[in-house]
Amino acid sequence: MAKQIEFDEKARRALERGVDKLADAVKVTLGPRGRHVVLAKAFGGPTVTNDGVTIARDIDLEDPFENLGAQLVKSVATKTNDVAGDGTTTATVLAQALVRGGLKNVAAGANPIAVGSGIAKAADAVSEALLAAATPVSGEQAIAQVATVSSRDEEIGEMVGKALTTVGKDGVVTVEESSTLQTELVVTEGVQFDKGYLSPYFITDTDTQEAVLEDAFVLLHREKISSLPDLLPLLEKIAEAGKPVLIVAEDVEGEALSTLVVNSIRKTLKAVAVKAPFFGDRRKAFLDDLAVVTAGTVVNPDLGITLREAGIDVLGKARRVVVTKDETTIIDGAGTAEDIAARAAQLRREIEATDSDWDREKLEERLAKLAGGVAVIKVGAATETALKERKYRVEDAVSAAKAAVDEGIVPGGGTALVQAATKLVELRDSLSGDEAVGVEVVRKALEAPLFWIASNAGLDGAVVVSKVAEGKEGFNAATLSYGDLLTDGVVDPVKVTRSAVVNAASVARMVLTTESAVVDKPAEEAEDHSHHGHAH
C-alpha cells in the first residue's frame, strides 16, 4: 500500500485541524447550559447526546492527516473516561487549547522538546494542587450533589447518592433500561468480580461493549476447560433449554473457547466465558461463594463431579449477567437469602479467627462482594432516543460520584482549574527558556473550560475568566451568578479534573513533537497513477 507523508509544520498543522474539528464538535456540550449534538446511526434513529466521549467516538474525518489529530484527541476522551468515567469534554477542550498554544510557540521557533517538558511539569503541578485543594466526600447529600452536577438532573443525582450510600464504597451500581417511563432504584443481591470476557466476540451490546445475558445459567468449573468433547454434552442440554450461559472457570481455551465463540457469532447459543478471579485456595473459595449466590454446584473432578457427566442440575441461575472487558456482574442469583446470610456469617467468623492482616483484607473483600449487593438504576423515558440520552447521563453521574468518593471534590465549572493556574506562576518563574514557555501554555489553557462554559451560557467567556481569576468566587453557569461553588453544590470530582489535565497534556506533547505524519494513499489516486504511467 503506497503511503503519503507530510513533514514539519505542515504535518503539525494538519493534526491541529483534526484536533480542532473534533474538539469544536464536543465543546458545545460543556457546562449546564451546553447544547446537544445529534449523531446519525447506520440503524435506527439518531442519538442525541451531550456526552463528550460518545460524540468523540463517533467522529472520523475524511482527510487522513486531520483524522490522525482527531484520533489523538479521541484517545484523551476515552482514556479520561476509562480512568474517571466523566470529564471527557473538559479533557478535549484542554487538549485543544494546549495543542493550539504549544504549536503557536513552536511555529515561532521554540524548541518542542523543551516546551513539552514544561507542559509535563505544569500538568504534574496542577494535579498536585488539585489534590491539595480537595474536600473529602461522604454522606448521601454530598454524593448526590456531585451526581446532580454531572447529570444536570436533581432526580438522577439523588438516586445515585442513595444507590452509592446503600451499597457502600466497594458496592456495585449498574444502569439498566427500564420497560416503564419511570426511572427507579432497585437494590438486589449480586456479585461483581474483576475478570472480563475471554473474547470480544461475546459482546452483545456494541454501544457499551458489554455482553449482557438475561435469565442465564451459570456454569462454575474448578479447573481449565479446553476439551470440546467434555463440554459438548452440557452445552447441548443448555441449548435445548434455550437459555444463555455464563461460564466461570480457571480458564477456557482451545477448541472449547472457539466453539463458544462460533456459537455466539451464529447466535445458536448465547454464551460468555470468563476466568475465575484470584489464585489457588482463594479462587476455589470464591467459586464456592458464587455457587451459593447462584444456587449452583462447582464442577470439581476431585469430588467426583466431572464436566462430561454434569447435567443441568449443577448450573446456577441469575436474572441478569453483565460482562465488560474488565469485570463481571451477576445480578439476582437464584441463591436464597438464608444461604447467602449463612455464607456471610461463616466469612465473618473466619475474619475474626485470622491473625494475618492480608488474609483479613482478602476475606473482607469477599464478604463485601457477597453481602454488599448491587444497586440497579432502571432508566425510563418516553422515546428510545430520550432513553439512550438519559442512560448516558446516569452512567456519567455514577462514575463521577464514585470518583468523588475516591479522591474528593473541588469547586466545579472550570473554576478549580483557573484557581490552580495561579499556582503555575511560581513554577514558570523558576524555569528558564522554552520550559517556562510550556508552563505558560498550560496556564493559559486551564482557562479554556471556564471560557467555554461561560460562552455556551451566552456570556463573554474572557470577562468571566478574568473575574474568577481575580477573586475567590466561582462562576455558576446554571444560575449565571458568582459565589462559593462548594456551598452551592457546583462541584467536580478531583479524579475527573486531574485525569483530564494529565491526559490532555500527554497528547499535546505528542502533537508538538511530531515531525512527520504517514498515512495510506487513497486507493483511487493510487490506481489513477498506475493507469497513466509516464504521461506528463
From Swiss-Prot:
Record-listed E.C. numbers: 5.6.1.7
GO molecular function term, any single one: ATP-dependent protein folding chaperone
Pfam families on file: Cpn60_TCP1 (PF00118)
Gene Ontology cellular component terms for the protein in this record: cytoplasm
Enzyme class: isomerase
Keywords attached to this entry: ATP-binding, Chaperone, Cytoplasm, Isomerase, Nucleotide-binding
Keyword Amino-acid biosynthesis listed: no
Gene Ontology terms describing biological process: protein refolding
Chief site of localization: cytoplasm
InterPro entries linked: Chaperonin_Cpn60_CS, Cpn60/GroEL, Cpn60/GroEL/TCP-1, GroEL-like_apical_dom_sf, GROEL-like_equatorial_sf, TCP-1-like_intermed_sf
Residues reported in the UniProt entry to bind ATP: 29-32, 86-90, 413, 476-478, 492
Cystine crosslinks: none
Catalyzed reactions: ATP + H2O + a folded polypeptide = ADP + phosphate + an unfolded polypeptide
Record's subcellular location: Cytoplasm
Function: Together with its co-chaperonin GroES, plays an essential role in assisting protein folding. The GroEL-GroES system forms a nano-cage that allows encapsulation of the non-native substrate proteins and provides a physical environment optimized to promote and accelerate protein folding.
Subunit relationships: Forms a cylinder of 14 subunits composed of two heptameric rings stacked back-to-back. Interacts with the co-chaperonin GroES.
Family: Belongs to the chaperonin (HSP60) family.
Protein name as annotated: Chaperonin GroEL 1
Record organism: Nocardia farcinica (strain IFM 10152)
